[in-house]
């Protein structure tokens, strides 16, 4: 179904992302990461696809050298990048894995305070902060910090 797509531009990038997903599903993570890295390096596709490929590669390459993964994520975590907050979340998890709880909490606080944070990401970050015993910020852009600390028993939100 993807054979008729041009290898250049957005459609070609999507086909390469789909191919990398198929490689991942087949258990060939090294090939999937290499395919995603190749897409991330291409200048003939829109930046959003390059950044997505780089983020997906970092997620698949989680078992490799923590410093290399951190470098990859830090490049995506810059303000204005489309996956900045997701990369910040992963960097906070890397901080925790490295035993740097305070750095992780600082990073998580910054995510919560960002006006562009999605509700799903905010919920994940708040839940993580509560599990770490960290105080939630007093003023959140939207939502209620108390709702995370004491969720409504009738809530249907998983």
Predicted segments, located by residue:
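Soluble extracytoplasmic domains of inner/organellar membrane proteins
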Residues: 11-16, 20-147, 156-158
């Amino acid at each position: 179904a993807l054979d008729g797509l041009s290898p250049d531009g957005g459609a070609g990038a999507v086909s390469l992302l789909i191919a990398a997903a198929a490689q991942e599903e087949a258990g060939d993570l090294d090939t999937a990461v290499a395919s995603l890295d190749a897409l991330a390096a291409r200048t003939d596709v829109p930046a959003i696809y390059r950044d997505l490929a780089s983020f997906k590669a970092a997620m698949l390459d989680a078992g490799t050298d923590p410093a290399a993964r951190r470098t990859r994520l830090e490049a995506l975590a810059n303000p204005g990048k489309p996956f900045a907050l997701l990369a910040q979340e992963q960097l906070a998890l890397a901080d925790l894995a490295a035993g740097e709880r305070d750095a992780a909490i600082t990073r998580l606080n910054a995510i919560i305070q960002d006006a562009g944070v999605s509700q799903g990401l905010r919920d994940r970050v708040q839940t993580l902060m509560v599990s770490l015993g960290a105080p939630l910020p007093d003023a959140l852009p939207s939502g209620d910090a108390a709702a995370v600390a004491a969720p409504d028993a009738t809530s249907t939100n998983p």
